[in-house]
UniProtKB/Swiss-Prot annotation:
Disulfide bonds: none
Gene Ontology molecular function, alphabetical: toxin activity
Keywords: Amidation, Disulfide bond, Secreted, Toxin
Main location: secreted
Note on domains (UniProt): The cysteine framework is V (CC-CC).
Expression sites (tissue/organ): Expressed by the venom duct.
Name under which the protein is recorded: Conotoxin tx5c
Source organism of the structure: Conus textile (Cloth-of-gold cone)
Location(s), subcellular: Secreted
Modification Isoleucine amide, positions: 14
Post-translational modification: Contains 2 disulfide bonds that can be either 'C1-C3, C2-C4' or 'C1-C4, C2-C3', since these disulfide connectivities have been observed for conotoxins with cysteine framework V (for examples, see AC P0DQQ7 and AC P81755).
Family note: Belongs to the conotoxin T superfamily.
């Protein structure tokens, strides 16, 4: 699954 998803936003860099 992609990093910038509803389950994982910390991967987005926020």
């Amino acid at each position: 699954k992609p990093c910038c998803s509803i389950h994982d936003n910390s991967c987005c860099g926020i």
